[in-house]
């Protein structure tokens, strides 16, 4: 039959018909691959933008943390300074009574006249404590004391003025500034007895 058709066509003097043009249809795999690649590209761009924003946030948080760390360091220095001040104050408070006691003891050594004044002996005790006295002189002085001063209210000035250590044979009274030394001599004489 094909041979008969060819013969008819050749008899008519016609040319051979041209082959039909077939339009190229994209394969399904190519379509899926293109869509996948496009979607992945958009997704990567979105993730990149999110990561960039996250990096900016982390950088800002790091700056804030550095500022907080410097503030904490300042507070820590203040706390350490306050702690050292409290420790030094506690040391001063604990050692202050001891220093005061030493000061009182030192005051006794440097100012002997002040604490020894209340311990001034009575006329009888003080006169008996002096060395190198005769019994006759003691009797005469006791009589003079009874005449000049009341025994109920003797004064320290009268007691010291009647002491033979303060009077010369016919001379004036010893100056009041020398009285503490005489008192010390009396106490030392009593201690030696």
Curated annotation (Swiss-Prot):
Q: Which PANTHER family does this UniProt record tie to the protein?
A: COILED-COIL DOMAIN-CONTAINING PROTEIN 184
What lineage does the source organism belong to?
Eukaryota, Metazoa, Chordata, Craniata, Vertebrata
The UniProt entry's coiled-coil ranges are 39-68
Annotated keywords: Coiled coil
* Disulphide bond pairs: none
The answer to whether the entry has keyword Acetylation is no
- State the protein's name: Coiled-coil domain-containing protein 184
The organism's place on the tree of life at top rank: Eukaryota
Q: Which residue ranges does the record annotate as region Disordered?
A: 101-176
Keyword field contains Kinase: no
Q: Which organism is it from?
A: Rattus norvegicus (Rat)
Q: Which GO terms describe its cellular component?
A: cytoplasm
Q: Where is the composition biased (Acidic residues)?
A: 135-146
């Amino acid at each position: 039959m094909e041979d008969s058709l060819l013969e008819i066509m050749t008899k008519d003097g016609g040319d051979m018909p041209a082959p039909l043009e077939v339009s190229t249809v994209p394969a399904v795999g190519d379509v899926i691959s293109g869509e996948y690649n496009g979607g992945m590209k958009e997704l990567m761009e979105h993730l990149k933008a999110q990561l960039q924003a996250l990096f900016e946030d982390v950088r800002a948080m790091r700056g804030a943390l550095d500022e907080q760390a410097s503030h904490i360091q300042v507070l820590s220095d203040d706390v350490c300074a306050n702690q050292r001040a409290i420790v030094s104050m506690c040391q001063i408070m604990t050692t202050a009574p001891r220093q005061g006691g030493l000061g009182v003891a030192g005051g006794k050594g440097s100012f002997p006249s002040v604490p020894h004044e209340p311990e001034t002996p009575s006329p009888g005790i003080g006169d008996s404590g002096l060395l190198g006295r005769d019994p006759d002189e003691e009797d005469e002085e006791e009589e003079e004391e009874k005449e000049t001063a009341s025994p109920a209210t003797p004064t320290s000035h009268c007691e010291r003025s009647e002491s033979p250590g303060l009077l010369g044979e016919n001379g004036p009274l010893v100056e009041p500034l020398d009285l503490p030394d005489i008192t010390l001599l009396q106490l030392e004489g009593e201690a030696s007895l």
